[in-house]
């Protein structure tokens, strides 16, 4: 087996593990935020145990990447007419805590493990597909793909900044969802 085939298998294996862990954790009776804390807490630990680290590169910020990460998700949702009508299912503090754990873990798993093996575009496609499968909302896919591609551009320059932006955008989405009464996740 070639190194490339092994790398692809490793990346796809992690994508399957992430999807399966979240799917299992969301089984009743847990709420969404508790499921995220459980699944992503375990996945983050596994990623660290596997050696995942955010590379210490510091070549500054990628303005195009940050813009795409920031506007990609809402623009993609708008283009495909995705409108979350449900109220956020849990309280603000619990959702903020859960989505910050999710952001850090997604950077350690998708960003530090899957993306180096599969590349940014394939990882963005799998990242978006995972969300569509788990959430059952296909109209989020384009926005999530664009969001990940923006983070990938930043990650190439400074992975820690990508993680901080990911966490900040998740946090802003939680607050916006609670203020508007429309869940963004």
Describe the residue ranges of each PLM region.
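Transmembrane helix-loop-helix hairpins at the membrane interface
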Residues: 77-82, 88-185
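Actinobacteria-biased recognition of intrinsically disordered, low-complexity terminal regions
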Residues: 1-5, 182-185
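Structural signal for the C-terminal ends of transmembrane alpha-helices
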Residues: 22-25, 46-55, 75-78, 152-155
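Residue-level signature of transmembrane alpha-helical entry/exit and packing/kink sites
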Residues: 3-11, 36-37, 58-66, 91-95, ...
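Short, aromatic- and cysteine-enriched interfacial helices/patches
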Residues: 63, 67-71, 184
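Alpha-helical transmembrane segments in multi-pass membrane proteins
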Residues: 2-51, 60-64
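Alpha-helical transmembrane segments of multipass membrane proteins
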Residues: 13-22, 43, 68-73, 77, ...
């Amino acid at each position: 087996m070639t190194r490339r085939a092994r790398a692809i298998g490793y990346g796809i294996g992690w994508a399957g593990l992430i999807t399966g862990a979240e799917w299992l954790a969301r089984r009743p009776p847990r709420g969404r935020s508790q499921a995220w804390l459980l699944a992503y807490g375990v996945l983050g630990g596994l990623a660290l145990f596997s050696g995942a680290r955010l590379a210490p590169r510091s070549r500054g910020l990628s303005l195009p990447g940050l813009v795409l990460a920031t506007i990609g998700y809402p623009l993609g949702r708008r283009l495909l007419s995705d409108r979350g009508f449900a109220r956020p299912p849990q309280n603000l503090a619990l959702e903020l805590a859960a989505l910050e754990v999710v952001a850090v873990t997604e950077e350690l798993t998708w960003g530090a493990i899957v993306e180096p093996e599969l590349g940014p575009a394939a990882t963005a496609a799998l990242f978006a597909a995972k969300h569509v499968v788990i959430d059952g909302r296909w109209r989020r896919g384009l926005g999530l793909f664009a969001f990940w591609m923006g983070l990938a551009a930043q990650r190439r320059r400074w992975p820690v900044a990508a993680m901080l932006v990911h966490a900040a955008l998740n946090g802003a989405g939680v607050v916006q969802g609670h203020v508007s009464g429309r869940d963004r996740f």
